[in-house]
């Protein structure tokens, strides 16, 4: 069973995580409370830690499930030759997990960032199972062919130095916590939680692969998948 690093404040994440084997890899998730399921789907470069307060607030009245995508959080972080790191595979992983743990009816979806394309991809394949959907800062729509990347993402994605900064210095995680929190600085203990699963070159693989998997032209491997999600919404 994966566990939190010892240096983290356990009171901020007071849950007993669970693991389901999906496609030969261990997928970590939280499963708290009883009732109709609320499925919380994170994006890049976060993990179920992002939803820790929602889990606490919702669990008295709902079954709350917060997943860690493969390569993220406390889930396995396989090499590229063992896992494709594509949108299609992540949608399939989420569907498989929910089937195996019996969360298949009256689902309330909460999706953020890359979790939007993944969660909406899963929800739209079985719309009769969805009760409501909460969408935060995301997109599940195909971009016009040959859309230009924001300069910083283009740089991360297409230059060797960009990849080095993501996987070597964890700049994507660290930068996100600065850019994404304007009113006040994130407390040190909370920052430590966001960074904890991504403490090495190998553990940051999925962060870069998410950036690389954004489809900006019809030749990209995830282009068709994203258009299929859009068509079902």
Task: List each model region and its residues.
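Intrinsically disordered/low-complexity terminal segments and short unstructured peptides
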Residues: 1-2, 45
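Flexible "cap/lid" subdomain of the alpha/beta-hydrolase fold that forms the substrate-access gate
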Residues: 2-19, 25-27, 37, 50, ...
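Short beta-strand element of the alpha/beta-hydrolase
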Residues: 36-42
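The serine-hydrolase catalytic nucleophile loop
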Residues: 44-55
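A short, Lys/Arg-enriched amphipathic alpha-helix followed by its capping loop at the start of a domain
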Residues: 53-62, 100
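N-terminal cap/lid subdomain of alpha/beta-hydrolase-fold enzymes
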Residues: 56, 67-70
């Amino acid at each position: 069973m994966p566990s939190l690093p010892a240096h983290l404040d356990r009171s901020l994440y007071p849950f007993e995580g669970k693991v389901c084997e999906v496609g030969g890899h261990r997928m970590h998730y939280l499963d708290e409370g009883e009732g109709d399921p609320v499925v919380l789907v994170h994006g890049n470069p976060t993990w179920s830690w992002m939803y820790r307060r929602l889990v606490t607030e919702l669990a008295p009245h709902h079954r709350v499930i917060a997943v860690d995508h493969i390569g993220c959080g406390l889930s396995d972080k396989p090499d590229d030759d063992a896992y494709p790191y594509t949108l299609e595979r992540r949608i399939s992983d989420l569907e498989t997990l929910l089937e195996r743990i019996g969360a298949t009816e009256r689902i309330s979806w909460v999706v953020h960032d890359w979790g939007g394309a993944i969660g909406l991809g899963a929800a739209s394949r079985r719309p009769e199972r969805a009760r409501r959907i909460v969408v935060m800062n995301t997109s599940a729509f195909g971009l016009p062919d040959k859309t230009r990347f924001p300069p910083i993402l283009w740089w991360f994605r297409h230059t060797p130095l960009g990849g080095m900064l993501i996987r070597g210095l964890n700049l994507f995680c660290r930068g996100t916590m600065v850019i994404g929190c304007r009113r006040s600085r994130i407390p040190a203990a909370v920052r430590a939680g966001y960074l904890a699963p991504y403490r090495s070159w190998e553990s940051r693989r999925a962060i870069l692969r998410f950036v690389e998997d954004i489809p900006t032209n019809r030749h990209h491997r995830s282009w068709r998948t994203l258009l299929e999600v859009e068509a079902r919404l």
